[in-house]
Amino acid sequence: MANVVENLGKLERRVTISLPKDAVQKEVDSRIRQLAKNVRMPGFRPGKVPLKMVTQQYSGQVEAEVLSDKVGKEFFDISRSENLRVAGQPSFAPKSDATEGDYAFDATFEVYPEVKLGDVATAEIERTTTTISEAEIDRTLDILRKQRVHFHARGEAGEHGDGGGDTAAKEGDRVTVDFVGKIEGEVFQGGSADDFAFVLGEGRMLPEFEKAATGLKVGESKEFDLAFPEDYHGKDVAGKTAQFTITMKKIEWPHLPEIDAEFAKSLGIEDGDLTKMRAEIKDNLEREAKRRTQAIVKNQVMDALLKISELDVPNALIEQDQERLVAMARQDLEQRGVPNAKDAPIPAAMFKEQAERRVKLGLVLAELVKANELQAKPEQIRAEVDEFAKSYEDPKEVVRWYYSNQQRLAEMEAYVVEANVVDFVLSKAKVTDKEVSFEELASATAQA
């Protein structure tokens, strides 16, 4: 008898599965006999429980297992014989109008869609490029110097003393203060501290607090009002105004290291050569620029492919991906040390839009890769592994680490496939180049 696959919508299908009751009962009887060999019941030795008692106790459970197994197998056979590309898991529901002597179930499921790829030549891509200038190297050196800043008390005697012991605190200084804050005359939790140090201008403190400390000299005090923002992390004081008293105890000025041989050595340049140091910084910036520009271009390519492609997305796959994203979110919370992260009430609905895009993009990429033979070649995978391994002390060990684990290798393969897709689209699409500074590039990718 031919199987009739009903079309319930764009992707939803239904097929009826019939199972002869005598075949089901035969399998149930066989499994119960096997079960009886080991089953335990009070008053009987193992394997000596009467078959009738085993049947009474377990027949319902065994019958459900047999039906589940047979329905699943029958559905698999039907989907294969009818060339059905089933997306996700089917749902089975028993039918009340089954033919006498049969069990009948409706299997409802979705199929993978037909993906209509648009003309890649119509896609428009803006390719971001950047050139590392000497000014960018200088800016990076300034950042590296600030990361190695150390402080000296104003008026300190010695090599770094600045003779400004009576100088008022200004931006960039590290200040040490005592403070007391009150709301309606009462000191609140976290509202007071002694010998509290922070750097003016870093934004660690609220603007009103930094403004009050700026301009004070050692030994001076100041009273001021501070309005906590409505969204302040301390819920007990959010939206309230406190009265603070602050006393300046110490002012230290920032001493940045000179760009010399010792500084170069601190960056890993063994002989302290400044030219080598600048070349090393340039290489690092170029690698980082390449990574960031590739990420921007990849996102543009993926957006363009979605824009020119037509397909319906199976809800079953969206729901599966939503659950994956929920699991990833819980794992992220757990890694951050959030208590009971595994049971965090994260609604899957918040990931629906993201999941739909991911599934849709996955289907489009699969079709594009298949149609244009963009699969990753072994030599491409090895080349990427070798390139990644270069940045480690023992590249051979990193290569071995990759090839010893199929999951890691599969991740690299996926990366290569994406790179093949990007290269393919860029070779066909309308591409315009846009030159930006490294600073603009870093800002753009940070906001993405």
Curated annotation (Swiss-Prot):
GO biological process: 'de novo' cotranslational protein folding; cell division; chaperone-mediated protein folding; protein transport; protein unfolding
Cysteine pairings via disulfide bonds: none
Record-annotated PPIase FKBP-type domain positions: 172-257
EC numbers for this chain: 5.2.1.8
Signal peptide segment: none
Swiss-Prot/TrEMBL catalytic activity: [protein]-peptidylproline (omega=180) = [protein]-peptidylproline (omega=0)
Pfam families the record matches: FKBP_C (PF00254), Trigger_C (PF05698), Trigger_N (PF05697)
GO molecular function, one term: ribosome binding
Entry's Gene Ontology cellular component terms: cytoplasm
Domain remarks in the Swiss-Prot or TrEMBL record: Consists of 3 domains; the N-terminus binds the ribosome, the middle domain has PPIase activity, while the C-terminus has intrinsic chaperone activity on its own.
Role, per record: Involved in protein export. Acts as a chaperone by maintaining the newly synthesized protein in an open conformation. Functions as a peptidyl-prolyl cis-trans isomerase.
Protein's name according to its UniProt entry: Trigger factor
Source organism (scientific name): Paraburkholderia phytofirmans (strain DSM 17436 / LMG 22146 / PsJN)
Taxonomic lineage: Bacteria, Pseudomonadati, Pseudomonadota, Betaproteobacteria, Burkholderiales
